Amino acid sequence: MEMASVFTLNVRLDNIAIITIDVPGEKMNTLKAEFASQVRAIIKQLRENKELRGVVFVSAKPDNFIAGADINMIGNCKTAQEAEALARQGQQLMAEIHALPIPVIAAIHGACLGGGLELALACHGRVCTDDPKTVLGLPEVQLGLLPGSGGTQRLPRLIGVSTALEMILTGKQLRAKQALKLGLVDDVVPHSILLEVAVELAKKDRPSSRPLPVRERILAGPLGRALLFKMVGKKTEHKTQGNYPATERILEVVETGLAQGTSSGYDAEARAFGELAMTPQSQALRSIFFASTEVKKDPGSDAPPAPLNSVGILGGGLMGGGIAYVTACKAGLPVRIKDINPQGINHALKYSWDQLEGKVRRRHLKASERDKQLALISGTTDYRGFAHRDLIIEAVFENLELKQQMVAEVEQNCAAHTIFASNTSSLPIGDIAAHATRPEQVIGLHFFSPVEKMPLVEIIPHAGTSAQTIATTVKLAKKQGKTPIVVRDKAGFYVNRILAPYINEAIRMLTEGERVEHIDAALVKFGFPVGPIQLLDEVGIDTGTKIIPVLEAAYGERFSAPANVVSSILNDDRKGRKNGRGFYLYGQKGRKSKKQVDPAIYPLIGAQGQGRLSAPQVAERCVMLMLNEAVRCVDEQVIRSVRDGDIGAVFGIGFPPFLGGPFRYIDSLGAGEVVAIMQRLATQYGSRFTPCERLVEMGARGESFWKTTATDLQ
């Protein structure tokens, strides 16, 4: 069967060729290897038509140019040589586009990422729209790869090596105005005249490359280059802790191209692409990408969601303010905040103002757009304006009676169809719904702090929650820009349940004499964004530890914290960063110096602060308890799948993405090896390390959680 055409060529009366990109039946344009023959056929036609004056590439999709290459192609490669051949094919096609004797212009609207930007870089000029949907970037590093179709060679020559390195090493996406300022595009125009401007550019001679800033020219020379790569290498190593091989290869490949010429650069790029595609880190990162894409498509239940036209929020504190912001400014829904104090409402409104004003200052948002978004948020100290709200999110104190009272008030003051969603982190949803007249419309909706940054939400139905309530809440979470996982109504839900033993073990090692900074550094080296002690300071020691007694009551002594340690810290009025007193010292605002541990913490908890464990030993103790608890959560159906478990850990607590999540990590070690490590730790440190039955059985049978080590889902 012949493949439907993705690239369509039309020649205008003025002899400008328009190549329209439109992958049939797909929302996004992505590049696949099988499109190569189509592109070559079009290039042949372009070369044969001697009347042509220029060429314009444009997308038929309403919100994307090309979103990148199809990642499934990489998963289908069995060897580094196969993946390298893919890169070489991409490089060759881009070279053929660039070698056309007439001007070739990319007319960009919407996402222009990865292979899409590499195609645009192969063109002689680029014009893009000023639409917020228009972003340009090379995000391959986030999949453990590097740009494989010439991006590592063309970008540094176009915008300068230091700017290009920042883009490629971080996967950073640029808005239109930023891209223009850096010289990545030649013009930024309204969408309505994009094609017209691109055509006019194609009629001129090839756009001459803009001279690079003096700084970039110095850094491109041998001395400047040596200094730059040394500095960037050091900074990158500090950031990645050596856990992401792609960053090292990016530096190596870009430097090769600059020092030895583009031919050597392209060779190095293709070779590195092939080798990186086979690394466990890239396989794990691609698995996270596929899993998160699947989760975002998951409706949560079979029932159709109810309409969502407006939302109410109870409580204007830190969480309430954050939830109001994502509901109004991301989901675009009108929000009404109720707080018993006018100050609470002001706090919540200021929260959104601060977020939006920051965007205005960075020129990511117009002041008029800020005002429009803020106008969606209103406040009240009673239930006026709540009568027709479709969903109410409760974000009040963690007190069961108070939350039950909120349910009663909402049922009394809101419509019969209104859903009550509690942002509790520790109280059973079934208990919150115990006295409800419409328990089927009560559900848990657990956000993580800070709300605007943390991508995960846990959606917690109790036994009586209806399928439609689940579907509607999932729909809201997605509108808010969140990745939702549906979890069972058991103590701690999923994320806090696997996090608690990890934090507890860190505190226990403190009491044994390990130093705060050693414990934190060990877990950062392992791959977490921050260490467990610093995390406790950031979240709030009072907030972070209040769930421990709840978990201990539900699951027994494996959740008990070291005796009196937490109470000693809290009794000394240490709540962490929020009150400037925690495990670390907090000086003046704005100081970026390295965090210092408060030496008073050691006598306070009766410890010496003289460690004996190596960094891997520290990490092993914390992580093994987390893995064991994650397996219990699968066994007890707290999570619906290992996919949700991996996504929940990576997006909810920063489990190292390059390991793919707890279940991928267990598979990579082997369940038998995990059991052996835990049995050794149980002998050394006690029964809390006893591996759970499911893990022991899987180890004995040589089973894994994922059916395959490839990136496809089960």
From Swiss-Prot:
Pathway: Lipid metabolism; fatty acid beta-oxidation
Keywords (A to Z) from UniProt: Cytoplasm, Fatty acid metabolism, Isomerase, Lipid degradation, Lipid metabolism, Lyase, Multifunctional enzyme, NAD, Oxidoreductase
Any one of the GO BP annotations: fatty acid beta-oxidation
GO molecular function: 3-hydroxybutyryl-CoA epimerase activity; enoyl-CoA hydratase activity; long-chain-3-hydroxyacyl-CoA dehydrogenase activity; NAD+ binding
Region of interest (3-hydroxyacyl-CoA dehydrogenase), ranges: 306-714
Reactions the enzyme catalyzes: a (3S)-3-hydroxyacyl-CoA = a (2E)-enoyl-CoA + H2O; a 4-saturated-(3S)-3-hydroxyacyl-CoA = a (3E)-enoyl-CoA + H2O; a (3S)-3-hydroxyacyl-CoA + NAD(+) = a 3-oxoacyl-CoA + NADH + H(+); (3S)-3-hydroxybutanoyl-CoA = (3R)-3-hydroxybutanoyl-CoA
Enzyme Commission number: 4.2.1.17, 5.1.2.3, 1.1.1.35
InterPro entries named among the record's database cross-references: 3-OHacyl-CoA_DH_CS (IPR006180), 3-OHacyl-CoA_DH_NAD-bd (IPR006176), 3HC_DH_C (IPR006108), 6-PGluconate_DH-like_C_sf (IPR008927), ClpP/crotonase-like_dom_sf (IPR029045), Enoyl-CoA_hydra/iso (IPR001753), FA_oxidation_alpha_subunit (IPR050136), FadJ (IPR012802)
Site description Important for catalytic activity, residues in chain: 118, 140
Gene Ontology cellular component terms for the protein in this record: cytoplasm
SUPFAM superfamilies given in the database record: 6-phosphogluconate dehydrogenase C-terminal domain-like (SSF48179), ClpP/crotonase (SSF52096), NAD(P)-binding Rossmann-fold domains (SSF51735)
Annotated compartments: Cytoplasm
HAMAP family tied to this protein: FadJ
Role played: Catalyzes the formation of a hydroxyacyl-CoA by addition of water on enoyl-CoA. Also exhibits 3-hydroxyacyl-CoA epimerase and 3-hydroxyacyl-CoA dehydrogenase activities.
UniProt protein name: Fatty acid oxidation complex subunit alpha
